[in-house]
């Protein structure tokens, strides 16, 4: 069983801990792992960090921006979204958080090393391995939560 060898389950703080060499293995978001990699390089910590795509594939998530139908300042929301969609701005976000964006006009502003990172901009072969998370029925979600809670508790 793997659980006795797991020292902590956390979704916060692991970026800096990874960059500083305090963790040996992490299951996390590719953007977070690439941020840790860059921090290790910038901080000259000596840590070699690589995001990896499992050979069996993985989940593909998307961030979206929405405006509620009853938003009191919808015009401002549209202005903000239009600002984010400016190629230079969209590219600066990709360069900072290491997530691809769908804005083709932004690609020319993405740093070369970021644009060539295949855990950020997936190859066609890797794209075929990825899938959206399944929408699970409520009873399955309850079982999933119970099992994960038990695992975290060390049982």
Question: What kind of region is each of these model predictions?
Answer:
Residues 124-155:
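Conserved C-terminal helix/tail region of periplasmic/extracytoplasmic solute-binding proteins
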């Amino acid at each position: 069983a793997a659980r006795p060898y797991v020292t902590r389950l956390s979704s916060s703080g692991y970026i800096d801990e990874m960059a500083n060499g305090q963790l040996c293995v992490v299951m996390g978001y590719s953007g977070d792992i690439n941020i840790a990699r860059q921090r290790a390089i910038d901080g000259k910590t000596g840590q070699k960090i690589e995001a990896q795509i499992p050979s069996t594939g993985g989940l593909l998530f998307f961030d979206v921006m929405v405006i509620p139908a009853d938003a009191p300042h919808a015009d401002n929301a549209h202005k903000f979204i239009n600002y984010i969609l400016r190629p230079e701005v969209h590219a600066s976000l990709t360069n900072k958080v290491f997530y691809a964006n769908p804005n083709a006009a932004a690609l020319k502003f993405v740093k070369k090393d970021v644009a060539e990172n295949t855990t950020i901009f997936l190859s066609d072969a890797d794209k075929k391995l990825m899938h959206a998370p399944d929408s699970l029925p409520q009873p399955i979600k309850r079982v999933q939560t119970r099992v994960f809670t038990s695992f975290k508790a060390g049982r």
